[in-house]
Amino acid sequence: MRRVTVKRGLGFLVIFVLLAAGWVVAQQAPQAAVTIYGFTFKPGELTVAPGTEVTWTNKDGPAHTVSATDRSFDSGAVSTDKTFKRKFEKAGTFNYGCQFHPTMTGKVAVK
């Protein structure tokens, strides 16, 4: 009798742990990445769902910025191998560029 109770208790414990792990995974926000290299943003255009966190990583020699043309966000100087993250909550198109290098531009479309 005791053996059945222990097995049943362990079964419930395993199910609880698996459900809890699934809940934690489900709570993570979607993510996307942009690499800064060769004086370009790669990809230059990115489409994401609302709630997505975008990470820009500078793999170039000089520092760059990730600055919205509408001034809604600005990374400041991002040095080599450093990152800038922004979570996009609302739908819209967000154009951005590098303040140090005006030919560097990109776009995040949130749909």
What is the meaning of each model-derived region?
Residues 2-111:
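Extracytoplasmic copper-binding redox domains, predominantly the cupredoxin/blue-copper superfamily
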